Amino acid sequence: MLNGHGDDIYKSSTEIKANFSTNVWYDADTDLLRSILTTHIDKIFHYPEPAAESFVQEVARHHNLQPQNVIAGNGATELFYLIAHAFEGSKTILPIPSFSEYEDACTLYKHQQIFVPLKNFQAGPADLMFICNPNNPDGHVWQLEEIENILQQYPQMTLVVDESFIDFAPTAQPCESLLVHYPNLLVIHSMTKSYAIPGLRLGYMLGNEDLIDRIRRFTHPWNVNALAIEIGKFLLQNGKYLLPDTGRLLKRKENFVRAFDELPGYTPVPSETSFFLIHTIHKSPVLKQKLLEQFGILIRDASNFRGLDEHYFRVNTLSEEKNQMLLRALRLLPITNL
């Protein structure tokens, strides 16, 4: 696992006043989620379902599929490792920059990895390919036609589409409609980001029954805990009322981006999501530490994304008050110390 994911609050003894380092929805109805968890708290005294069967049934119903087309995971990340295990030793294409756990999973299972820059991206023959749509860390959106072209052009290659952030990008089209036409497609969903439950760990995978069977052989029993199963079912049934208002969120993000444009030494990278990269003349690891120590503000140092360097960091869009807090802090930091 890469040392340096976002939301690394646990590493700091400093009080965090504003956490820009994670792409999780910042304004979720945590009181409602807490009440659902409390309702089911006694389930912790019993073993959960071995393969989260009732959650899988609800996922299948939600997506108009069969349970045989679904695997539940202890977060989306577990699913990436299951796929890498099932395709152990494969030739695998990884666009960069992107989420590090694709690479980490492939490294663990001895894949021959081919890193292809996202800029002017061209696919090629391989056994497996991972894409993140919209992409983390830069908010790039893959058009549905691009995804379908890859599936058509390389029918022997399994394409994994990670849609963990799709609720934050109105221009991104879900590709589950392609599942019926392409047996070489896997779609990953995370419950973590849109509903702000990263500590519960819950995600799921959709795909052709034969492909799902190949991967299911590597799953472990009881990989999803009892509380995650219950809140997952609740969110699939009622979650549309809890999703981010992306229209308002992205308007605030555009204001945030414009403010960065006016800051000397900071250049925001175009993004179609609420989070975005910023290129800076400063060193991001130092900037991160200064913001944390002096202002209690946490950003995501993006220097450890393959394809980026120490002059990139990532921020999520938060409330107007917290966005202004970061901008004021950057104006106050002495440039000579960065």
Which ranges hold each PLM region?
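N-terminal "arm"/small-domain region of PLP-dependent enzymes with the aminotransferase-like
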Residues: M1-H46
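PLP-dependent aminotransferase class I/II
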Residues: D29-L32, N184-E262, Y266-V269
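Short, conserved charged micro-motifs
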Residues: D31, A126, K283-Q289, E321-M325
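Short loop-beta-helix segment that forms the pyridoxal 5′-phosphate
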Residues: P48, A60-L82, P95
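PLP-dependent aminotransferase-like
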Residues: H85-E145
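Active-site pre-lysine segment of PLP-dependent enzymes
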Residues: K119, G124, H140-L159, E163-I197
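PLP-dependent enzyme catalytic core of the Aspartate aminotransferase-like
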Residues: E145, E293-Q294, R306-L338
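Conserved PLP-binding catalytic core of the aspartate aminotransferase-like
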Residues: L250, L263-F295
